[in-house]
Amino acid sequence: MATALQKQLAAIAASSTHQLDLKAQKSAHGKSLLFEPKIAASQSFETVYLICYEGFRDLCALDSRFLQFSKSLFSEQSKVEDRTQMTKEENKKLNAVVEAFITLVVNTPGFFNALQAHTVRVVKAGHQAPQMISFWSTITLEAVFGILENTSSGRRDIQSQKTEELVLRILPVLNSCMQAKYGAETVAACYSIVTVLAGRGELGEKVLDGLMEAVVLAHEADSLNACLQCLAVLAEQRSPAQLPPRVIRRLLKVPQLSQKLVQISKQCRVHRLTLGCALGALASIDRLEEQRDVFQELMASGLLTEAYTRAALAALVTSIRDSAPGSTEHGQLLDLAAQLAETTYFLDGMRAAAKSDNVDLESLGLTLAPALETAQIDNDEDEDMLDVDDVSSQAIAAPKVEVPDFAVQSFLELDASQSFAEVANAFERAVSTHQSSPFLASKSLGKENAMHSNLYLSLLARIWCSSQLPAARIAALRAAAATLKSAEDTCDFQNLIPYLLHALADPSAPVRRAAAACTVALSEASGSQANTSTWGSSKLYGSSGKAQKHVSQVVQLKSEDVSTLLSSILIPMLEESVMDPTFAIPAIREVLEGSKGSKSQPKHGMNAQTRTYYRLSFFASHLSLSPLVRIRIILFPIFNFSGKVSDTVRSNTILPLIQGWCTLPLAEASKVCDVEKVTLEDAYRGHLNALVAREAKSVQLLNELMIESLDSSKRLLAEAVFDKVAAVWPATKSEQRVTLARTLLDMSFKEGKDDGEKQCRERAIEILRNVKHDSATLLTFLESVPAAVQMPEGPPTKKRRRTSRNEMARVELASQDDVQRFVAKADFGFFELIEGSNPGQPSQPFSRVYSLSSTTWQPLKQQSGSELVYVQSMILGSLTPIVDTLKVSDLVVHGFMHANTVQQQKDTADYQSSVRADLLIDCIRHSTSPQVQNSALLLIANLASWVPELILHNLMPIFTFIGSTLLRQQDDYSAQVVDKVWCYHFTQTISRVVPQLAASLRAKHKNFLTGVSDLLLSFTAAFEHIPLHRRLKLFSELARTLGPQDSLSAIISLLADRYHNGKTQRRFSTELLLVFDPIHTLDAIKGYLDLVVDAAGPKRKVSDSLFGLNDKTAAQVETAIKNLLVSLADLATDDRLRAHVTRAFRRKDDPARPREVFANIVETTIQLSKKVASSPKLYEACSRVLANCLDLLPTTDLVKSAELLLVNTDHQVQIAAIKAVELRAGNAVQNDKKSVISLISFLPSVEKVLQQSQHTDAKIISVGCIDRIVERFGKKDMTAVASIAQTIAGSQALSSGNDTIRVLSLLCLTSIVDVLEDEAIALLPTVLPTAFDYLSQAIEGEKNGLHNAVYSLLSNIVERLGYMFSRDYLETALRLSHRSAVGGLEDTCDESRRTFYQNVSEHLGAQETFAAIKTTWPHALSQGFEASSEHLELLRSTVDLQSKSKLIKASSTLSEQAIDSQEEQEYDDEEMNQLDNTLMSRTCHGSEAQRCPPSGPFFVQLVDQEGPMSAKPEYAVTFYKFLAAFFDKFKSDCSRATQATSSTTQPKMLEHVAQEDADSELRSAVLGALQKSFQHDQDAFWQAPSHFGTILKPLVNLLTISATEEVTEVVIPTITDLAASSSSSIDNHRELNTILLRYMRSDSAATRLATVKCEQSLTTRLGEEWLGLLPEMLPFISELREDDDEMVERETQRWISQVEGVLGESLEGMLQ
């Protein structure tokens, strides 16, 4: 049973990619783009270099820029460079060189892509020129041709990939450009590209179909020929003959298609395109009659080859057959076929197509002229052996076939081959012309005397066993059957049985059926009488002198045995034999072998050995005497079984026969095979298949034939022999396998003189590598190694050489060539095969291999002047699996498995005595090859778990080597070596060795860490070189092996000291601690601190060995200690580590242990802080360590520890403890009740520190801790929070002189208000005045933090206790907010202030808020625009957020605010407009929210107090803007407001603004309000004559003002809206028109121009309704056409055109 060790080693061997894995090396080396894998694998680096260097010289001749690579990539040194041995930096530099070379040598696809994109853009824009298209097509054609040419060599998958990439780059361009609208030149250029692409590349069917459709759709009359040529090329590349439907439809529409195809056939092949067109025309005949003419023209064009013509005619016949008889389509097809049948060529083609499809043309309704039917095989013939020569009466007589002259008595004689060939050929012609009966009846063949003569039946038997056509073989079998049926009962035809068996294995089913019928006839003709005569018993194979020496005559079976063989064996298997050609021979072998499971075996069986012997002898004698190689190849498998009976026949007949054939001269064997039309290779393989693997004589013969095959003329024999050796090897017995192995090994080392020997050598090496070898074979290989006694004994004299330490002296062999040959032989023959075999019984090989490594290979290494890396690796690789097996044997010895213990123990002791660890250590330490080092380490690992006492003293050098060298390797194999060596074997070894090592160190009064310091330093030094994915596993195994209690702290501290608290080191240290038990983490921290204490003490012990402090100055020592402390402090902050340590305190088995360890950690930290008190940096670092270590504890334990630490008067300790609790409070979970209770219980302790401590830092951290606890868990215990609230609001916190404490206190009070809510009311009288005072100071001093903290508290009080926030508080807050708005503070201050405003708007009452807003409005105005804007924004938000009921209650206040808000300061226009807009928008929004438009008292009050004729006319602007906003907002709901400002106010204001010195802004505001009133007058207020007449005259009078721009933009639209509001009153319009007509005759040109523009606006707006007054206007229009002012004339003409457009008629006649 495989152990875990064996499985691991098997995993290494399976996944290893190192150079020692020959199969993997060969596979990797065989990857090439230029050569086949087999060729590439055989090429050396020297060969590859020469090939590359030749090309490189050519490149340098073309471009001198390549010369720079002659010193790098193409230097002599490049042949020996190994990337796996290069450093990461060296590989990076090499990559840069390779990339530079590739960039220089490859083509430039960027230009090609840019050219294609540019061409597509130009073509799509229609700007292409012939020169450009020619240039583009030339470049693209050359590029496509070149790419396809380059992809024509190399591996198939790479060719397909490159072709696909090219197609993906080219097809989009062709798709864009190959369109008829872009011109014939562009399309023709695309056709050329498609032609090259399809002709040179291997495209898929879908791509070809798509290209054909695109090509045919893009053609025009000018490009038709080019289109057809392109389609012809595409059709040649397609597999199916039918063209795509869209293509065939377009092609069949081409006039005179056949003539066009004939024209282009001179330039390219059009056969498949013509066939596709013909098939397409044939398929559409039923729809279009003209397609019949197209089909006929294409058939008659001569463009189709004979095969394609038959394909078209076959399609025609199939169409006739599949069409419905009597249908129109059927009639058309018959007419077409009849027309084609008038031509003999097409008639023969249709007949052939009909025969191949088994279609009777006459049954289809097609009557053809009679013709000679050719000979055919009827697959459905009966078994009645009818004469095959029956000829139809319609057949035309053919020339008579005569029998050639011959002079043989039997056609199975050895010399009858020539005569048989002539007669057989004549017989085949006779069969084809239905003359077989006359031919066989020829007197010379002796058919009448067939029972007593060998001539006739021997001819037939040889014919059906020959390579003649199936028809001839069938005719021969039928003729023989007919003869057997007419035979006499006294004749025995047993000698035909072997030949009938051959026929039953024929590959043709009709032949096997004929053979079955003949076998039945033979069985019926065989008589059971004892006195029957046997046909062929005399001279069947000629005279005995010509027979084989080992067989003189045919063995004859008894009549009853023949009858049994036929009736009980052959006849039952006939049915299955006819179905399966491979059934008959195995079935016969099973019967003869005596297999009871054979279906063919009769019940009474053939079990007698004598009977079996005679039957085998019968078949063997025929095979020996028959001249036919075919029959031997077929019947040889009958003898492929072992047994007493068969062994005799095989030894006497079969094996000599095989040997005789395989040793025939090549010319003679080739001649025999040529006569029978059998390949010589098949003949050799057929004979060798008769060899049996378990038979000694067969293996011996195979071994002899291997030697025979060294002859260069026997290459085919060699291939067959070696294939047979590989096939029989697994089943061969061990003794015979050793014989074959020796021969193969000898052949593998022969230096080939010719091709034959080279071939044999390669095949021998291949077989030895691929087959499995047992221990006996491997031992045979090892025994071939020369003994050490053949070498000179002892080292040379000291005068000549000195022997270096731990190395063997150099010795000399006979010559250097002997050394090289010996090494080469051992490389392959011994260790390579041994390594690849993994022997199961390694007893003998182990001792022998180890002996070779110590006595032979060390001298050879010295003698050869080389390290013999490959040989050493082979030796070590061979020993490793042997040791694995020996370890299993060792388990047997110790009673873990059942076996012969005494013998096993004796063997195990012998094997252990052969082990020499010093040799392996030398391999590790002195070899420069990583392969040798890795192999030696694997072997040592196995030995360590087997015989650990032998490597105990070499343990530390091995560890040091791994840490300093192997861990830095980047290759996968080194990783696996380290993993296996370290993780498994050395773990076991150290578990047995380390206790002894520790005991030894303690006995010598030495510290354990001091003893292993070198080991630890080696591994930590290699830390940064070890790949990331391997670090954790390696160091965890190191710590586990050495003991985590002692080693873990040392490893962590060494990493911290060496890498100075780097992120990588810190993260790794955390992960390493997480691997082990939580208690080990605490132990590691304690040990870490012990090391730091030792380093800080006056007498250092362990720290000197680990950190090398003796070599450092005092400052350097202090820095080192600081780095260690900082690293530990940072390490303790990791969340994962904290969670890990927490689990230590939750253990139930030993709960006291973690507390004891942690108490020691605290004590040690305090001791350390006292020691380094003189150094502030170290003291601070100790404080951090203490705080962070406290943070490692669970919450309950942390709080208890912190309470104890607060007793300490050292404020830094207090700060650390409180900070730890604060941090824990921020991370604690709400559901953790124990933690929450413990944290709340901590409040009195921290309150005490706040009250008593004189240190600001302590106060700051205390307030912060209280805030954190209250914020997160205050709701859990409101009583505790209430008790601490007074302290926070008192002199020690809120009233402190330190701004930081003030800020924290304010934030803490914010949290307290959140928790206490109503319970916090008592704090307000104390807190709010202080807060307002701090806010005032913050604004003046620009203290942003204090400012924001106050607003945070105020916002929270407003939100939680809004009903207690009085108007006085609010007014104070608003005034301070005004100052804050203009104070120039940060953006965060603005945000906090807006938050406060938002809370005021949402949580305070509307009445109080509006009152405070009104009261503080003057103050806001006095502070500036920002304050005023925010003040109004507060008004807006209050209106938005308050409910309807509250707004109604506060409506009077809101109205007063709106009226008072007009009294604004002197701001600039932009600010004024912004304030006005804000005020108007919010007032309207408030009214809308109340669902009561301002048409009541508010609006009357507003009009009376601030209306257009108030004491302050400048406020009228704001008033009318209000008015416009109201009208626009409430639309038809503002009728009462319209009435309030109509007759009494508006005319007066219009008269006021009509004055020249009136304010233009006021004028625009007044007209804007009027315009909105006109637009929304749905109650017809302005339509009333009283209202209309009142407003009309002052409004129209504004046309006379000098402000032309205002007239156009404001006055005229307002007049137009007034007219539109009275659209149904003609009187109002006439009144308006009268005034306008009067103004048309004004003396002022500006007035006349304004009046004309007003008329234009009215005409546009009112249309025909206004033009009803046209008769009154016409005289005035005529006058204006001749006005003195040019502008008036122009605008008048534009007005006339406008009127004509509305009326649809000219005014010219009316104006005359």
From Swiss-Prot:
Gene3D superfamilies: Leucine-rich Repeat Variant (1.25.10.10). GO terms for molecular function: snoRNA binding. It holds the Pfam family HEAT_HEATR1. Coiled coil: none annotated. It is found in: Nucleus, Nucleolus. HEAT repeats lie at residues 164-202, 490-528, 564-605, 987-1025, 1236-1275, 1605-1646, 1667-1705. One of its GO terms (cellular component) is 90S preribosome. The keyword Oxidoreductase does not apply. Keywords: Nucleus, Repeat, Ribonucleoprotein, Ribosome biogenesis, rRNA processing. One of its GO terms (biological process) is positive regulation of transcription by RNA polymerase I. It comes from the Eukaryota. Component of the ribosomal small subunit (SSU) processome. Involved in nucleolar processing of pre-18S ribosomal RNA. Involved in ribosome biosynthesis. Belongs to the HEATR1/UTP10 family. This is U3 small nucleolar RNA-associated protein 10. It comes from Phaeosphaeria nodorum (strain SN15 / ATCC MYA-4574 / FGSC 10173) (Glume blotch fungus). The lineage of its organism: Eukaryota, Fungi, Dikarya, Ascomycota, Pezizomycotina. The gene is UTP10.
